[in-house]
UniProtKB/Swiss-Prot annotation:
<keyword id="KW-0503">Monooxygenase</keyword>
<dbReference type="GO" id="GO:0020037">
    <property type="term" value="F:heme binding"/>
</dbReference>
<feature type="transmembrane region" description="Helical">
    <location>
        <begin position="2"/>
        <end position="22"/>
    </location>
</feature>
<dbReference type="GO" id="GO:0005506">
    <property type="term" value="F:iron ion binding"/>
</dbReference>
<dbReference type="InterPro" id="IPR001128">
    <property type="entry name" value="Cyt_P450"/>
</dbReference>
<dbReference type="GO" id="GO:0080132">
    <property type="term" value="F:fatty acid 2-hydroxylase activity"/>
</dbReference>
<dbReference type="GO" id="GO:0016125">
    <property type="term" value="P:sterol metabolic process"/>
</dbReference>
<keyword id="KW-0812">Transmembrane</keyword>
<keyword id="KW-0472">Membrane</keyword>
<keyword id="KW-1133">Transmembrane helix</keyword>
<comment type="similarity">
    <text>Belongs to the cytochrome P450 family.</text>
</comment>
<protein>
    <recommendedName>
        <fullName>Cytochrome P450 90A4</fullName>
        <ecNumber>1.14.99.-</ecNumber>
    </recommendedName>
</protein>
<dbReference type="InterPro" id="IPR002401">
    <property type="entry name" value="Cyt_P450_E_grp-I"/>
</dbReference>
<dbReference type="GO" id="GO:0016132">
    <property type="term" value="P:brassinosteroid biosynthetic process"/>
</dbReference>
<keyword id="KW-0479">Metal-binding</keyword>
<comment type="pathway">
    <text>Plant hormone biosynthesis; brassinosteroid biosynthesis.</text>
</comment>
<keyword id="KW-0349">Heme</keyword>
Amino acid sequence: MAAAALLLLAAAAAAVVVAMALRWLLLLGGPAAGRQGKRARMPPGSTGLPLIGETLRLISAYKTPNPEPFIDERVARHGGVFTTHVFGERTVFSADPAFNRLLLAAEGRAVHSSYPSSIATLLGARSLLLTRGAAHKRLHSLTLTRLGRPASPPLLAHIDRLVLATMRQWEPAATVRLMDEAKKITFNLTVKQLVSIEPGPWTESLRREYVKLIDGFFSIPFPLACLLPFTTYGQALKARKKVAGALREVIKKRMEEKAENGGSIGDDEGKKEKKDMVEELLQAEGGSFSEEEMVDFCLSLLVAGYETTSVLMTLAVKFLTETPAALAELKEEHANIRDMKGKNQPLEWSDYKSMPFTQCVINETLRVGNIISGVFRRANTDIHYKDYTIPKGCKIFASFRAVHLNNEHYENARTFNPWRWQINNKLQNAVGANIFTPFGGGPRLCPGYELARVVVSIFLHHLVTRFSWEETEEDRLVFFPTTRTLKGYPINLRLLSESIC
């Protein structure tokens, strides 16, 4: 068995090397290169080492708390738009806010969304991230219908209950890994919105598999990975099958219930508010969504709801802890809200709108943390920008991080300063220039961005009005394969004497 496994691994590695070698030869002298002609000039840059390009340099930089030198050195040498070679492909890297805006707005015309094959396989071809054109438009519209209305009283009440239920499980003097706790909140909230299942053994089992699935996003997709379960990608494929199977069972049951009711969801089919995303899908467009479409769609929404919002919650607490003046002002804002409401009254939309400094904190956490570092696009046609021509088929990476942390756009850009977002601050003009893009933009603007803000705001409210805390050990940020803290940000909690948790 061991010998067979080694043979399979060797075959997989050989296949990867051959595929990368062929891709390298095509990039150097294939048809695309011939089409460029003498007049077409790619942005300057370096393709690095044969086969691997600059991939190892990029990964090495992004596995540190300070990946900026990778970008800074190339921008200083080549300008805000440069060529590199990462993840097996020549890629144009943009740190230019104007070009980034062009790319975001041109989705579906000059460019289309394009991600590594590992992500595409694990999410599914019908996921919100990977669909294009009319298919993406209808999925995006459905997501907005369900997740783009955070002012809904039932949704606000559920978020409030879920956050408090999680915090009540913490001991009065507990040590917790905040990122793990935040992920429980966001995962359970997303599952509730998708399939109306409350936290319990089913959701926890699903979450454990989902962690394995996400770990495989930026791993090497070996051709025989399905036969190599000991690899990260092989484990992710296995987890994907389990997650999809669990979602499929729920969806199939709901489809059967609809059929038994003569094509209706139930007695309340005519009600304006659908109970979850599956119900939205079953009734949308005359019930035209297939079972596989619904599975892929729900699976991809779990990624959006689970990973990014939980990291935002954790980084907000980390940055506040490192900036005592900001934490003090945030505590004052939320103490005032609690004093006006009373200790046991749930938060409402009017309370959320009374958190201006909280929104400054969230904006600054998004800007400094860059939970989404940027987006991949692929050119549908030759793109002419300044003196350069980016040929059809070329991959492009629009870096939000490079823009957000550039001192030309933000004063002391690499310092956490939530006051820069106050309305009377001149640096607020940065938003008007459309260079602040933590949720993307254009047709692929994140449909749940306002909901994410609401969840983080409610979480911060209950945290600062019920607990004090301190870091138990130093924990640092890394940005590959995703933005996170290495240790999950462990903190010691102390229940405030006047709080009722």
